[in-house]
């Protein structure tokens, strides 16, 4: 902080050089005039000698002022309060001292020096205030750092206490959680031991029950052979009735297929195909119907085959077990097989006949419909040709572009150029 103050003061001293030089010139002029007045005065010899001594001293001051440097004048003026009268009355005062005092006392220079002195004083006071403020700031920072350290210590202590308390709580909760787990394990073990004993006690009783059931069954079987044969015949009758019901269901499905596949739909389809030009889409539609009927037929056949196999198995069992009622049993399966065969072959014959009818009807209808449509196609083709010819004629009648016309004329002229009819000139001529 001291260097900028001194630098500023030195700068001010440098700025004062011009003022000092200007004031020095003014003072020298004044002194020259006073020297001339003193030499021109007349009087007694003592007065003349006195005036000569004064004039000599003024000349010495003038020469000293010329040799003085302006910085020296300003520094001496700023340093001490100069009193010109005191310095002149001193017998030992030199010409340079008197010259400096005379320049410093000049009113113009005195004003500037007073301003500089006030600035220096203000700078010193500001410097003292800055040091005081810095010292106060340092003291406050020290106090703040001490407070923060104290607060941090308190916070760390509180955190440690909180962590210790939380750890204790966690340990207590773990201990409490372990106790019910052990209790539950003991209860489960007790429960497991109880049912095991019960099962061990009950298990010996099971084989005795099984033995009793077997003995009862063995007692029942030799006593009632007739009842067994009757029960088997009843079972066979029930199975036959279920098979007949299934066969009736198969007949109903085949009848539904027949209703779904009527001749009226075929006739309508072929009429539509004969009227429309795109017959492929109709064929695809009808082929889709045929595929659906095939899927249903295949499902019917599979169900009927399974029924037939079951019937054969039941028939074998009946023939092996019952010898007394063979005639009745033979009559019943024969009728059932006839029914099954009739249902089975009827569905197949019906589907085949429907397919044959479809194959036979389709070419007939097409052979009948296409000759009727032939004149219509011819008329349409003729109309299209006539329209194209009319369009080409209209295009030819339209005016050509001028560039096309010019090229056409040029070609005509080139084709019409007459052959050269003059004499050929040779070098001999």
Swiss-Prot record:
Q: Where is this cross-link: Glycyl lysine isopeptide (Lys-Gly) (interchain with G-Cter in SUMO2)?
A: 190, 316
Cell compartments where the protein resides: Cytoplasm, Perinuclear region
Q: Which UniProt keywords apply?
A: Acetylation, Coiled coil, Cytoplasm, Isopeptide bond, Phosphoprotein, Transcription, Transcription regulation, Ubl conjugation
Sequence segments annotated as region (Disordered): 128-285, 311-429
Q: Which Pfam families match?
A: BUD22 (PF09073)
Which residue intervals are annotated with compositional bias (Acidic residues) in the record? 249-265
Where in this chain does the entry annotate a coiled-coil region?
42-67, 108-144
Compositionally biased residues, Polar residues? 128-138, 146-160, 373-383
Q: Which InterPro entries would you find in this protein's record?
A: Bud22/SRFB1, Bud22_dom
| Cellular compartments per GO CC | 90S preribosome; nucleus; perinuclear region of cytoplasm
Q: Where is the composition biased (Basic and acidic residues)?
A: 183-195, 311-341, 357-367
User: Positions modified as N-acetylalanine?
Assistant: 2
Question: In terms of domain of life, where is this protein from?
Answer: Eukaryota
Residues recorded as bearing Phosphoserine in the entry: 203, 205, 264, 279, 281, 349, 351, 367
Q: Name one GO biological process term.
A: maturation of SSU-rRNA
Its biological purpose is as follows: May be involved in regulating transcriptional activation of cardiac genes during the aging process. May play a role in biosynthesis and/or processing of SLC2A4 in adipose cells.
Assembly and binders: Interacts with SRF. Forms complexes with SRF and SRF cofactors ARID2, MYOCD and NKX2-5. Interacts with the N-terminus of SLC2A4.
* Protein name stated in the entry: Serum response factor-binding protein 1
